[in-house]
Amino acid sequence: MLSTTDFRRGLKIEMDGVPYEIVDFLHVKPGKGGAFIRTKLKNMINGRVVENTFRSGEKMVKPDLESKDMQYLYRESEDFVFMDMESYEQMHAGAAQLGEKGGYLKDGMELKMLLYKGQPLDIDLPASVVLQVAETEPGVKGDTVSGATKPAQLETGITVNVPLFVNIGDRIKVDTRSGDYIGRE
């Protein structure tokens, strides 16, 4: 059991049989009456964000989440296909579930997947990934102006702002949390 005093960003709780992740919370102590906590919760199954208010000290159920080592295999229309590293079973996760994280997946990448009652909820990506630039404007000699950037589409389909000297075919390191360019490989 979890109490509202344990609330922090990223904490997972279960309400009405559905797992939620705390996106934001605010402890409010009015002049009259008991304290309460306002929260923004992300439904981990469908991705919707809802607001909810809890009384201070209220008890919550911790969801039964399981973390498994998985390997990303390929994309099949709107699904991403993963393989369990222990049992070699294949598992499908929808693009809606993974959101922007799906854009950083490369064939053969090993990662941890969060499961709820055997169904995939989320993946833990490495802090950075190396991807190849598939499309961008060509660099011109002398493009070394500090801070100037241009958009580049990467091999997985995501678009990242890169410095002017980056060309098609270059392998770049991208931060998976912010989507920022880190450097060339």
Swiss-Prot record:
Keyword Protein biosynthesis: yes
Gene3D superfamilies to which the protein is assigned, alphabetical: 2.30.30.30, Nucleic acid-binding proteins (2.40.50.140)
Gene Ontology molecular function, alphabetical: translation elongation factor activity
Domain of life: Bacteria
Key word Protein biosynthesis present: yes
UniProt family annotation: Belongs to the elongation factor P family.
PANTHER family, per database record: ELONGATION FACTOR P, ELONGATION FACTOR P (EF-P) FAMILY PROTEIN
Protein task: Involved in peptide bond synthesis. Stimulates efficient translation and peptide-bond synthesis on native or reconstituted 70S ribosomes in vitro. Probably functions indirectly by altering the affinity of the ribosome for aminoacyl-tRNA, thus increasing their reactivity as acceptors for peptidyl transferase.
Annotated protein name in UniProt: Elongation factor P
Taxonomic source organism: Solidesulfovibrio magneticus (strain ATCC 700980 / DSM 13731 / RS-1)
Lineage, highest ranks first: Bacteria, Pseudomonadati, Thermodesulfobacteriota, Desulfovibrionia, Desulfovibrionales
